[in-house]
Amino acid sequence: MGSMAKSEATAFTQSLAATAASDAAIAEWYRTTNYETLWTGPEDAARRAALLAAIATAGDHGLPVPRYDATALTVALQSAETEGDRGRVEVEMTRAYLAWAQDLTAGALEPQKIDAGIVREINRIEPKVLLARIANGEPEAVLAWLLPKSLQYVQLMKAKLGIEAQIAAGGWGSAIQAVALKPGDTGPAVIALRDRLVRMGYLAPSAVASYDRAMQAAVTAFQLNHGLTADGAAGEGTVAELNVGPEERLKSVIVAMERERWMHFDREVKHVWVNLPDFRAKIIEDGKTVFETRVVIGKNVPDQRSPEFSDEMEHMVINPSWGVPRSIIVKEYLPLLQRNPNAVSHIQVIDGRGRVVPRGSVNFGAYSARSFPFSMRQPPSDGNALGKVKFMFPNVHNIYLHDTPSKSLFDKEVRAYSHGCIRVADPFALAHELLSWQTDNAEAEFEAALKTGKETTVKLKQHLPVHLVYFTAYPDAKGRMTYRRDVYGRDAVLWGALSEAGVELAGVQG
């Protein structure tokens, strides 16, 4: 190598090493490969072009474009005049590739830094693995391998592009200037209702200016897709949802895509899917819903909102006793007992050795929330807070699915009333479904255990993954987008974090 070539190589290496010094993984990669280029050498054209093409689609994925910035990298490549410039661009492209790969496969945000109620284990692929893949593999295949593969993600991305096209075409028309509307009504508000339903795809174009049967059917379809009571009348809640603009729906879809990236792992062929804002639990098998039931989730107050996490269901307990959570004991029951020692008489007071303590022997007034030394338990009974069966997937949150004697809450549209656990509307049917995978007499065996009145644990021979999720935007079985209210306000917080990271709404100003 001549002196000029040596000096150029030295300038490239020194510039690359200096630029990569602040990133240990990148610096280590180039040291171990003797500073072999990935992007800026003459033989790197295909890899370079594939990366630039991939990151140019960042906006389509609802990812922060400035984090990868294909345009800026292209300009940097074209304007690199010296070997020092080339060394800097080499590292910039590697950083963009790693950021792109990490964000696509595990999300652009760290969820628990955004909301403590989102407990997702984000398993990010190590940089050296990602770099080895792109260095040794066919570039386009490697970049395709990074893309989320779930059908839901693909459908969300399609919905995102569709909403953006609708926004560019003028949106969904004027807001409905009415609190509520009903079949038979006429006037400007009904025309606005008609026009929005047409633009949303629920109603065929029409000049009809009255709330007729076709409009009633369209409203019913809208209600079904938005978790509303499907009565065909545009009541206050329905009008409020109809008036939500496409920009807000777009935010919901982008947030849902980020949540999908957090769950970029094998969800198993068979699993339980509890979508909190939908107030429903499903068993999914081979991509199809084989069981579905309404649920009640935690109240929208601190410490009672149901968390988002994944675990495995291991067993069910028939005729369960209820071990009262410490928070309920000291916040709710202790004050009652201090006023009246015979309050909540259906609950037993238990000492540290597991013995039932006579209430007359306890001076409840002598204890504070911190010093109260007893636990409390409700034995199996018809009025037990957990009903007749609970479904356990042991976790640090002490969250599980269970029956309840309070059935009336399942008729409500918004079902956020528990202390955090998931109450199930059809617990016996759920038990039968779970047991049917391990016995031919599921119903009979369940009923036999139930009739004993005794607490009975039934282990599941095959543990079942359980995913508690929070999607306010998701495709239904036919691929049509459905939306739910942001009951805990988590989507609003996530959108704020994504926006701060550089995610923008395409075609929306301000």
Where are these regions (language model features)?
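Cationic-aromatic interfacial patches
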Residues: 1-122
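Well-ordered beta-sheet/strand-loop patches within structured domains
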Residues: 1-29, 91, 98, 118-119, ...
